[in-house]
């Protein structure tokens, strides 16, 4: 089993190291990851990127999508699967799928026809913000365990016959035992807002505040509900694709002059 490993927190982040070490137990792993933090850049692309040798593989002066394209298109890598992560912070809900650099790396791999897994860890809100939180390798143990299991078994089980990629979100390790795994779908809840102050606008994501309060009405079976309640969420997803049944649009096109 050959794995191309990337992330959006940067190749020296603790999360990618934790995942690299876990995956190395079951696969040959080559990291092709950003040289620095590229969080929340989505599928942003560069025209050219510089590569640097790194003990884990290659550091790329570019985005997560750049890394996947470089790895699959220029570095002669032929992985069985692409893994992105492990992200420092959850990537939950439909609205983050196009924003997250971690998830976007998995989507980029899907367009290459390569199965992919995006992996993130949910850090419950406490006295510090996610920006102030300083995780260590043990915080990624549950996520690493889940991803290693999926990498080792998902292809053989036919998981990617129906899904292009998996979005995996894991809680912090429980005090005893391991978190169970649940197949989920992304939550529909969306609570972005903007607050104007003179010539500036503050962009606010109220989801994180409500997660801390435990007041988000996520129904059973959704990714955020599972993770907040201490389960590993696995959402099987497809890359963007055409839809059908657009009679109304067809009628408009016929009348267009």
From Swiss-Prot:
Organism the protein comes from: Natronomonas pharaonis (strain ATCC 35678 / DSM 2160 / CIP 103997 / JCM 8858 / NBRC 14720 / NCIMB 2260 / Gabara) (Halobacterium pharaonis)
Cofactor(s) required for function per UniProt: a divalent metal cation
Lineage per the UniProt record: Archaea, Methanobacteriati, Methanobacteriota, Stenosarchaea group, Halobacteria
Protein name per Swiss-Prot or TrEMBL: 5'-nucleotidase SurE
Annotated localization: Cytoplasm
Cofactor note: Binds 1 divalent metal cation per subunit.
Region (Disordered), start-end ranges: 234-257
The keyword Metal-binding appears for this protein: yes
Catalyzed reaction equations: a ribonucleoside 5'-phosphate + H2O = a ribonucleoside + phosphate
Binding site for a divalent metal cation: 8-9, 39, 87
NCBIfam families associated with the record: surE (TIGR00087)
Gene of this entry: surE
GO molecular function terms noted in the UniProt entry: 5'-nucleotidase activity; metal ion binding; nucleotide binding
Pfam annotation, one family: SurE
HAMAP family: SurE
